[in-house]
């Protein structure tokens, strides 16, 4: 069968016009069908893209963040809500359809990090949601924030949620592995260290910690290509794995 070549701009966060190296990925192991992805690596610097392009990229990221944040503020909310809170990996899923539950709400924003979560957390907890499933931190690493910064912000997120909505159940989901040969600032060794800290924090606060990393990793701790085309975000099969791993917590 003839290979199919498709050019796709993959964004670490939301939208950008800066594209870098192309990689060829086998889509169907039973055929020669493949796609060529134009990937935006984490190593974009002013040596690779001019300052104006990077400035426009950052402006687009911030605009997307505030557009989503303001949209969420306009939507109805109740104490029955089950919130999925995170970055683009959360943002890209249709959660209420996945669980066939209209109480499940997507509050992911592409490009978000732990600082962004803290900035908008009050808008989420003021309605006293039933549950919050959190996955955040991979972008912190891409933005060169330290592990201690990520961990400290998690503590603030947990404490702030408890202070404003003490009945809300908080579920800490591990950061997913990546293909760190492409996404070079998101080293899986660092992700593992963060996840170890998140598991410890969950014990300290008597929260449920959900180890998704182990479900998505290969033997060498990279994101299994069965679940992703770009080495960072998930495909449909990946979201089904995620759903099955947490279904009992959503339903409890």
Regions found by a protein language model. Name each.
Residues 147-156, 187-195:
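Charged helix-capping and loop-helix junction motifs
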Residues 1-83, 95:
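N-terminal secretory targeting modules
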Residues 48-59, 101-114, 142, 231:
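Acidic/histidine-rich helix-loop elements
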Residues 21, 177-252:
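Catalytic His-Asp segment of secreted/periplasmic serine-dependent ester chemistry enzymes
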